[in-house]
């Protein structure tokens, strides 16, 4: 049976793991969200999130955005290649509804998969 959990092994945890993604990444981006990724040696993708206070002032809004992205990753993790992915959130995402953010991030997962495989 397929597991849809978001365990510790599916997260980027250390600064070194985050830093490695920024060196020569595969990119998929929109005006509000950018995904950076590099292939990893694990048998699953891993996710790291950065939502800057500069773009999203309130903590509850930052948490809402991170929760939506984490949930989308959790549900789509079996369709995403074995990559270390960092999600960067930019200005404009705060005005988006939850459904819009979810639709956008799912589009970016597919775009990232195509760029990695193609």
Curated annotation (Swiss-Prot):
It comes from the Bacteria. Gene3D superfamilies: 3.30.230.10. It comes from Shewanella sp. (strain W3-18-1). Keywords: Endonuclease, Hydrolase, Nuclease, RNA-binding, tRNA processing. NCBIfam families: rnpA. The keyword DNA damage does not apply. It holds the Pfam family Ribonuclease_P. InterPro entries: Ribosomal_Su5_D2-typ_SF, Ribsml_uS5_D2-typ_fold_subgr, RNase_P, RNase_P_CS. Belongs to the RnpA family. The gene is rnpA. RNaseP catalyzes the removal of the 5'-leader sequence from pre-tRNA to produce the mature 5'-terminus. It can also cleave other RNA substrates such as 4.5S RNA. The protein component plays an auxiliary but essential role in vivo by binding to the 5'-leader sequence and broadening the substrate specificity of the ribozyme. This is Ribonuclease P protein component. Disulfide bonds: none annotated.
């Amino acid at each position: 049976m397929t597991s849809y959990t978001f365990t510790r092994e599916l997260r980027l945890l250390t600064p070194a793991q985050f830093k490695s993604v920024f060196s020569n990444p595969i990119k998929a981006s929109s005006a509000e969200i950018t995904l950076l990724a590099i292939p990893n040696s694990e048998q699953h993708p891993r996710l790291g999130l950065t939502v800057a206070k500069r773009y999203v002032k309130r903590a509850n809004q930052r948490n809402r955005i991170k929760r939506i992205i984490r949930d989308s990753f959790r549900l789509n993790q079996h369709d995403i290649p074995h990559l270390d992915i960092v999600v960067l959130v930019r200005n404009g995402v705060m005005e988006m509804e939850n459904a819009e953010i979810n639709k956008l991030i799912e589009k970016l997962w597919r775009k990232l998969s195509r760029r990695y495989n193609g």
